[in-house]
Amino acid sequence: MELFRRTLAGLLMLVVAVSVGICVQGKFIDAVRLPTHTRVIGATYTTLSDPFYETINDEIQMQIKSNGDLLLVRDPGQDQERQNQEIEDMLNKGIELLIVNPVDYVGVTPALEKAREKGVPVILIDSKVDDPELVTCTITSNNYGAGLLDARHLISQTKSARIVLLSNSDSFSSWDRLSGFCQTLTKSGNDYRILELRDCGGELNRAMRAMVQLLETFPRIDVVMAVNEQAALGAMAALEEKGVLSSTLVYSVDGSPEAKALISEGLMTATSAQSPLRIGRMAAEVVYEILEGKPYLTNIVVPVNQITQEDILRYGTGGWQ
């Protein structure tokens, strides 16, 4: 359990560090005088306190910088109104292309409409939106497949379980993952019971509070399915506090180094691993295909892989895939 405590403490410190760092970065970037030939691209993510989005951004940043261009980065901290304001601000600063992972797949629509009015192409990351006509290119993991893989592993472990689902109601990818999970369990014909679907925004602290409440409501929970690893870690903290972590199967999606270490120790059951490195590289490639008028794909789906204790050595625990 010591590994889990160190992992949780480190992630909580990261949330604070990233939040402070991104504010400083934003002020610095806006003050830079750019060469006239430099292209300026805007990027905004649900939250950069999630290492998944931080890794995607780092990969894009590296590619953009290597081309002598500039990436304006904004972190709305899971606030859609703030994200819309930041997008409008970047559009007014003259960005040539926008990369966005929306806080709310419906609520982001006004900002995307303004991008279209200004003729700024949009690359959507790890989500869908209410109006796909407002988006130039969409890059997502196989989110339905991620839920399906977690469900298949659960089916291989037990034919009967009481399950709670931790979701992010504003995220399209969250619903895809839970659809893949629940539909696969239903098709199995086994005795699986969904006790409750609880929205925690995919956030660590909210998931921890939600799990505390769920444990008070339900005397027995066999399985937790969390839509991302931040939510899974929050749930695991509550399960450990209650003394039932070792008897609860915990599934998630992401494939972070922290989660892989916990899987290696037998503390987390399995995760469907995304590849933020690959997503970031693909996004950067599409940026220049669009800006240079080259052919590009409008919909890119990146495969996911299941990671369990049985095959953790194949993936390692030292970094993202």
Please report, for each region that a protein language model flagged, where it lies by residue.
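Short, solvent-exposed amphipathic alpha-helices that sit
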Residues: 52-69, 146-150, 173-191, 206, ...
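Hydrophobic alpha-helical segments within soluble ligand-binding/sensing domains
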Residues: 83, 138-164, 175-176, 204-208, ...
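Extracytoplasmic "Venus flytrap"
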Residues: 40-59, 63, 67, 72-85, ...
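Flexible loop/hinge segments that line or gate small-molecule binding clefts
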Residues: 105-145, 156, 162, 256-264, ...
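Hydrophobic alpha-helical
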Residues: 102-115, 181, 196, 200-260
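Hinge/cleft segment of the Venus flytrap/periplasmic-binding protein
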Residues: 8-11, 21-30, 185, 278-321
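Short, low-complexity disordered leader/linker segments with a strong preference
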Residues: 1-38, 113-118
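An alpha-beta-alpha
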Residues: 41, 60, 148-197, 287, ...
